[in-house]
């Protein structure tokens, strides 16, 4: 006779604390660039650099706090799948841009 018990070996869900930390960090990482843009007192270069850096930090916060990406034995396969997906997307976008710019260079000039 088969057992009715199920063994759950999947990665655990986050706690309320990890979601709260992720939310607070996300709000802070969004508010800083928003303030810099709305204030207008910062140089264009500093504003763009801050937006890019804090945007990348926010991506990492979302991956860790909300998507539960970690290097534990359960989460390692999710990380590997995510890395593979990022590589494929970068290849598709990069090679598409290469084809578009190459085609533009080969076009005859308009008279």
Curated annotation (Swiss-Prot):
GO terms, molecular function: cytochrome bo3 ubiquinol oxidase activity; proton transmembrane transporter activity
The gene coding this protein: cyoD
Record has RNA-binding as a keyword: no
GO biological processes: aerobic electron transport chain; electron transport coupled proton transport
Stretches assigned to the Periplasmic side: 39-46, 102-111
Designated name of the protein: Cytochrome bo(3) ubiquinol oxidase subunit 4
Principal location: membrane
Source organism of this protein record: Pseudomonas aeruginosa (strain ATCC 15692 / DSM 22644 / CIP 104116 / JCM 14847 / LMG 12228 / 1C / PRS 101 / PAO1)
Keyword Transferase attributed: no
GO cellular-component term (any): cytochrome o ubiquinol oxidase complex
Cytoplasmic side of membrane: 1-17, 68-80
Primary role: Cytochrome bo(3) ubiquinol terminal oxidase is the component of the aerobic respiratory chain of E.coli that predominates when cells are grown at high aeration. Has proton pump activity across the membrane in addition to electron transfer, pumping 2 protons/electron.
Entry's family note: Belongs to the cytochrome c oxidase bacterial subunit 4 family.
Keywords: Cell inner membrane, Cell membrane, Electron transport, Membrane, Oxidoreductase, Transmembrane, Transmembrane helix, Transport
Transmembrane portions of the chain: 18-38, 47-67, 81-101
């Amino acid at each position: 006779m088969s057992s009715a018990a199920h063994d759950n070996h999947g990665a655990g869900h986050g706690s309320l604390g990890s979601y709260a930390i992720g939310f607070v960090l996300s709000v802070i990482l969004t508010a800083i660039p928003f303030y810099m843009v709305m204030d207008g007192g910062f140089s264009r270069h500093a504003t763009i650099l801050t937006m890019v850096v804090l945007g990348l930090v926010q991506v990492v916060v979302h991956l860790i706090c909300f998507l539960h990406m970690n290097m534990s034995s359960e989460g390692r396969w999710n990380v590997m799948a995510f890395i593979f997906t990022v590589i494929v997307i970068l290849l598709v976008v990069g090679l598409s841009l290469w084809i578009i710019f190459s085609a533009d260079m080969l076009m005859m000039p308009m008279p």
